[in-house]
């Protein structure tokens, strides 16, 4: 990734994951050789901090097992640390699709510290798949109280725009 963007001085590559606290966590994903074995190219996009989330994709045509899952450790930093480390004052468009951790990231953003013009995020995993519960309601209220208008783009995604 770094090599692809060497000529783009306005792009900064951060190898940390963003979360609500600084810590190291295990990340689970489908092994490369299992993607071929399972016969589903889209399996390469399945990753989670919860192994069970991956196993829940099991169906008659997608017979994934624990042997198909690999894990690595990832260092997390908070959104505020990212902003501080890279001296970011504003963001035009923030896109968040992190397989269920959207709530933790959005909850941790300090809108008094950084200006974000628009935020698009996947909302389907906040309170259970496609269920609007207290977590999603909390984030919607936080965004509205910080001057954002919310648009439901489809059944999975919301756009918050100033």
Describe every region a protein language model picked out.
Residues 1-162:
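Phosphate/nucleotide-binding beta-alpha loop and adjacent structural elements of enzyme active sites
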